[in-house]
């Protein structure tokens, strides 16, 4: 179902999703405990999608929930994701790149399974969460391998079909790129936005996006990233939390 602007309407609009954002919600508590770095990333993405949703007229609560839980499947193997690793540990160093690809890509199916099992997440929200990588290539592992077929290193999910799914994909990609650029001391919000969206478009991930919506998203994210630039998105506390857990 869509509204007059072609945006999808939540099949359970009367279903209040705000309680899923409470810090005491059991699944969120488990996610935050097992994946401190990923949960912080998810909260940052949540702030981005919330701001974008407001200007696009989307359900900002649903979008924020989808952002908070889009990576919850990483709980199955948290140490394999860089945001949850300490500086001196990376289990991928000793693995074949394709094995690493299989491990990382599995979090999409794991996310779907966890959210379906929870029973409080409507199906359209689960779809948004599980389309956030589309068929993107894991360039790091592909470049590390000697494989010539990049399709072997693509996520095997569906490309985003709705404005909500595309917004989450864009915000997730931009948050990850911003974090990396900040850590390397070369963060420029406008460059991050333009290059990230251009890469997604060139790879065919945003084929369903309307030009007008895309411009609105760029402008909204520019404001969000300017604020993040002042605060310098930082995952050091999450790393400290991990280190403290190891020492207990």
Identify the function of each model-found stretch.
Residues 1-32, 248:
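Non-catalytic interface/linker regions that flank or bridge core catalytic/transmembrane domains
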Residues 10, 15, 22, 156, ...:
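Regulatory/sensor and coupling segments of signal-transduction and defense proteins
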Residues 11, 20-21, 144-150, 154, ...:
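Histone-fold modules and their flanking histone-like tails across chromatin and transcription assemblies
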Residues 201, 205-248:
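Long, hydrophobic alpha-helical segments that serve as membrane-spanning/inserting helices
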